[in-house]
Structure formats: C-alpha cells, structure tokens
Amino acid sequence: MNLILAILLMVVCLLAGFFLGTWFSQRQTKKLLMDNPPLNEDAVRLMMGSMGRKPSEVQVQQVLRQIRAAAKQSDTNKK
C-alpha cells in the first residue's frame, strides 16, 4: 500500500511541476514580449518605407503605441 501511495505521489508531483513550469515560462515569455516587442522602430520605418512613405518620428511612435496597445488589449481579453 505504501508503494502505491509513493508512486501516486511522485506522479502527482511530476504533473504539478510540469504544469507550474509551463505556466511560469509562458508568463515570463509574455512579459518579455510586452517589454521588448519584436517590432521595433527600425522595422516600422522599413515597413513604412517599403510602402512608399517616408515616416516622421511622430508617425513611427504612433504606430508603435498602437501595436503595444493592441497587444495589451488582446492579452487582457484572453484573461
């Protein structure tokens, strides 16, 4: 009986560790992406330049704010 209980406890601990590790890594990844978005100012300038526009600094910052706001809103909608 003690052996079955020990094995069951090990399995439960392994599953709990797996799910907690997954949750923690997902949370850290989201935080990292919110702090350092993969789309930076240079990428926005390049994208707008490829569309035939010469963006001003105000336009670049506006696009970045819109992207960050959309990401934050989608993150809060998922919760």
Curated annotation (Swiss-Prot):
TM annotation in the entry: 4-24
Keywords: Cell membrane, Membrane, Transmembrane, Transmembrane helix
Main location: membrane
Cell compartments where the protein resides: Cell membrane
UniProt topology in membrane: Single-pass membrane protein
InterPro entries for the chain: UPF0154 (IPR005359)
Name listed for the protein in its UniProt record: UPF0154 protein llmg_1186
HAMAP family: UPF0154 (MF_00363)
Family: Belongs to the UPF0154 family.
A Pfam family: UPF0154
Organism: Lactococcus lactis subsp. cremoris (strain MG1363)
GO cellular component, one term: plasma membrane
Source domain of life: Bacteria
